[in-house]
Amino acid sequence: MNNTKQPVVILVGPTAVGKTNLSIQLAKSLNAEIISGDSMQIYKGMDIGTAKITEQEMEGVPHHLIDILDPQDSFSTADYQSLVRNKISEIANRGKLPMIVGGTGLYIQSVLYDYTFTEEANDPVFRESMQMAAEREGADFLHAKLAAADPEAAAAIHPNNTRRVIRALEILHTSGKTMSQHLKEQKRELLYNAVLIGLTMDRDTLYERINQRVDLMMQSGLLPEVKRLYDKNVRDCQSIQAIGYKELYAYFDGFVTLSDAVEQLKQNSRRYAKRQLTWFRNKMQVTWFDMTPPVDMELKKKEIFTHIAGKLEL
């Protein structure tokens, strides 16, 4: 192959498909260090709702970009791109293989491709008007507005993530071009010798796993975790737009019952999983591996390892 670019492994897939466990086993086999590809695991104190890996689950494998910000801090795709590219260099300099694991498609895409962010498309007045519209009409109203104007961007952004929805609308408003057009107009050259692995699963099985995961989160203390943030008056922040937090904030605000909030959380998680799969299938050259039970995990791990080793000529 004689590819002189830095090798990077990327493991993607929808929430609850089993990325965490497999990533640890692969990292050990590949002598890799893991970089989080999840937009919400960067926040401290948001562990249960983001299904953040525990130190015990890491089994000694170094992890990066987890617990680096307070919930009040903002964090952009450009910030992620810069941090991860630096981490990739650091890991490679240690003689290790960088591995990105997560499900935030736009974040991962921004790292892999020669994509630069522009600050030109800024209109604070428009942004403020959209924020007021979100507060008045609700997040779904704004997301529907984006879906009508830029379906591709809407598919990649969760309705709860008002900040990113407004940013996509702002780009359209100021430049006359969709976020998708901006991406397409830029060079789409891969900056790395990247092997993209995707985990998928039968939809009914995946949805059942998502429902079970939410139940387990509630049993593990998600409600008090969110209450701690609520009591600290952490509001109007990017972090609280995460699935699992916004739904329970509505409960603490007295707008919905707890059972309705949990049901909404399950529904939003299932919809997000569907959008994740759509994004990765349409936007990136991913090799997919089916994880639908019953599956021999040891055999599946060997199959994926062999694929990676072949691509990177290990």
Curated annotation (Swiss-Prot):
Residues 38-41 are annotated as: Interaction with substrate tRNA. Its EC number is 2.5.1.75. Substrate binds at residues 15-20. It catalyses: adenosine(37) in tRNA + dimethylallyl diphosphate = N(6)-dimethylallyladenosine(37) in tRNA + diphosphate. ATP binds at residues 13-20. The keyword Zinc-finger does not apply. Its cofactor is Mg(2+). It comes from the Bacteria. The record marks 104, 127 as: Interaction with substrate tRNA. InterPro entries: Dimethylallyltransferase (IPR039657), IPT (IPR018022), P-loop_NTPase (IPR027417). It is an enzyme of class 2 (transferase). One of its GO terms (molecular function) is tRNA dimethylallyltransferase activity. Belongs to the IPP transferase family. Monomer. HAMAP family: IPP_trans. This is tRNA dimethylallyltransferase. It comes from Bacillus subtilis (strain 168). The gene is miaA.
